[in-house]
Amino acid sequence: MKFSSVSEEKPGLLAPPAQPLTKMFQGAWLCWASLLLLVRVTQPCPVGCDCFDRKIFCSDEQLAAIPLDIPSHVTDIVFVETSFTTVGTRAFSGSPNLTKVVFLNTRVHHLEPDAFGGLPRLEDLEVTGSPFSNLSANIFSNLSSLGKLTLDFNRLAALPEDLFHHMDTLESLQLQGNQLQTLPGRLFQSLRYLRTLNLAQNLLTQLPKGMFQSLSSLQILKLSDNMFARLPEGVLSNLGSLQELFLDSNAITELSPHLFSHLLSLEKLWLQHNAISLLPVSAFSSLRNLTFLNLKDNALRTLPAGLFTHNPGLLHLSLSYNQLETVPEGSFANLRKLASLTLSHNAITHLPENVFRNLEQLVKLSLDSNNLTVLHPTLFHNLSKLQLLDLSRNQLTMLPGGIFDTNYDLFNLALLGNPWQCDCRLSYLTSWLRLYNDRIFNTHTFCAGPAYLKGQLVPNLKQEQLVCPGNPGQLGLDDREPAGSWDLAVEGRAAHRQCIYGNPEGTVLLACEEAQCRWLNIQLSSREGSDVTAMAYNSSQEWELRSTCGSVRVTVSIEAQAAGP
Amino acid sequence: MPDLPSAFLPLLLLSKFVTPVTFRHHRYDDLVRTLYKVHNQCPDITRLYNIGRSVKGRYLYVLEFSDYPGTHEPLEPEVKYVGNMHGNEVLGRELLLQLSEFLCEEFRNRNQRILRLIQDTRIHILPSMNPDGYEVAAAQGPNTSGYLVGRNNANGVDLNRNFPDLNTYFYYNSKYGGPNHHLPLPDNWKSQVEPETRAVIQWIRSLNFVLSANMHGGAVVANYPYDKSLEHRFRSPHRTSNSPTPDDELFQTLAKVYSYAHGWMHQGWNCGDYFPDGITNGASWYSLSKGMQDFNYLHTNCFEITLELSCNKFPRQEELQREWLGNREALIQFLEQVHQGIKGMVLDENYNNLTGAVISVTGINHDVTSGEHGDYFRLLLPGTYSVTAKASGYEPKTVTVTVGPAGPTLVDFQLKRSTTQVHPVQKAPGRGQGSRAKQPRTSRKKDQAAKRHRGPA
């Protein structure tokens, strides 16, 4: 009886607990799913901002504070021309996933001491175009992952020495366009992995000697647009990895002989727009990897012999806008890879015959705006790859025959602004232009003389216009064989001898062969309106023209015909 | 080289001694940062402004270069470059960012050619008209084979098929009489176009642009108007034909300026296609309606060409430097062309500026109008022309002008108030061009009134 009672009771107890448990589980699951959906759906974009996946752009000029409701999944936030003026302590601590924070031309002028605290993953921080002028020493102290810091175009006048002391991972530091006058000597001491340092457009006049001594990884250093008159010896001595150095637009008057002596990796050196008047011969002797050198707009009067001896890899060299009067013969002897050489806007009066001899890879040569009067016939020989040659704005009256004979690729030759004398000595040039150069490039190249050709376009000249009075037009030799010789060859040559008769002013020219005359050129009055009067109607004029063949008399008359059909 | 105007004189290649720029692709945030950097670096000659927003809300930023940025100086022409109209065609975007950095850097280096250009020209650079499409293309990565991914805007619309179609109206007017310039917009145009198109239209109506280029990819050729074939409606859509504008010779010259200054465009053989001189009439290549370059010509004073710049629409980062070196001289020379032709002031007897005066050139069936400051600009090739200025209520004036190779030629007009009391006669359009009814615009207000009466085109 007891056994039967116990058995009956047990099944009854098992049923009720199972059912409520199942119901509770289902309810919990539904509740969880609803919460998930709600969270996702209700992630709002902060007012005044635009959201693109994990990036936020806040461009509302009325945005008066950093939003407190930045979604937590956001990695990039950019503020453009917003109006809040302060970044408060730990302003972004609710967004621990941020890797990029950018302020562009905002009104921020105050960064609280721990403004960027709570951003362990921040890699890229930029505050640019803002009116803030100072930073507290520990403002960046918690940014352990930062690789790129940009503080361009603010009003920073001074930087605390410890500012970058905990930024071990920094690779790029941009401080361009501030008002820095001096820098503490140990400012960059901790930046062992820095690759790019930009201090351009500040007011720096000097650098402490040890300024860059920790920057052994530095590849690009920009010091352009400051007020350096000199750099201390040794300031660059630890920059063995440096590839590009910008010193342009300063007030540098001289370079110490060993300033660059440790820059063994340097490829590009920008020294333009300074006041360098003298270069020590060893200035570039350690720069064996140099490919670009810009010395434009300095005050160089001479180049020391051997200046570029140790730069065999140089590809582009500019010496324009200096005061060079000539270039020593061996200056470029070792620059066998040079592709571009600019010597324009100097005071060069002559060039040694072999100065360009070894520049076999030269493509572009600029000699414009100098005082060249005569060029040696072999000056451009060996320049078989030359494509562009600028001789404009010099004092050239002619070019020697054969000067371009080995310049097979020359298609762009600039000649304007020279006082070309368009007589027989220009025959080579005009023939060459007709064959090899597109006349469109010389549409402003005019003759300066002789008087009757002044103002004529050089490329449009005909060969027979290029004559020298008193000389045979075709042959360069007087034929001295006695007349009456039985030698047919001599007789044939004599029969084709041409004489050019001319008057002293060069206004009347007559081309004749032995038995007849072929053309007559008369300039009745000078283009300059000189005192020579033009011929009137119904008048005649007579000239006696001379050449080495003798003299002839030419009479020209002009008769006005009665009007008729 | 074929015969080309003497404007090629400054063909000496720009020096390679320029500060190197970073050659990389720019996503939207990098584009904004780069533009702000250029503006901050050259604050006295630049202005950064936006003309509107894309579908997704990205700003269409424009960087202006001028010696007085933000101000139109009378007789100083406005020019524009537009890039990245198709989001996946990205070289134009990168070139325009490089050009911005280059102009700033060369200005600071006191490059005389660039100094003169910035002093005499007001340059507007819109690196990306389709920033949403760009992000779609960039997300694919430059090596994927998706040919059209990112071409359209976020609404799936091809922006170079989205402008009001004024070609049909012009072709009709050429035949039966009617305006040959500043064709009106339909009343409901704003509801017909995408936000990016609307922003650009409002932009080009707000400034009196004279010259323009918009940049694409997929070919290497300089394309000039018309894009829409004159014969399209009457022949098989598969046949294309040359469809010249009244300024065909001028447009060919503008296109040749770019192609011959380019490193290799002029060779003609590019991307497996051949275009003589590296140029093509748009319609003779293939016809397209509602394009931006035709709209510029038909609705405004602006002469626009379309530059196809690279075979690969989204070139690899490593190719960008070569592309920049190949395009740099062309980008500068093309801007310099805005100084060809004639320009001047249109004034009344009391030396007040006349806005909306019509400048006609005999033999060219396309007029231009004077701007809000009374100045006008008419691009012309070297030659001798008969030029007439007309304004409502004033006696027309005609002068003979010789345009030289170095321009522009200054030609001012002073118009006397008309003393004739003839009432305007309402004529039905007659046959032939001689009876064309010109509608000079003396003020925007009057133009609005005229548009309301006329109704949709």
From Swiss-Prot, chain B:
UniProt-listed InterPro entries: CarboxyPept-like_regulatory, Peptidase_M14, Peptidase_M14_domain
Annotated Zn(2+) binding sites: H86, E89, H216
Cofactor(s) the protein needs: Zn(2+)
CDD domains: Peptidase_M14NE-CP-C_like
Sequence ranges assigned to domain Peptidase M14 in this UniProt record: 24-338
Organism: Rattus norvegicus (Rat)
Protein name: Carboxypeptidase N catalytic chain
Biological classification of the source: Eukaryota, Metazoa, Chordata, Craniata, Vertebrata
Protein encoded by which gene: Cpn1
Subcellular location as annotated: Secreted, Extracellular space
Residues bearing glycans: T400, T402, T409
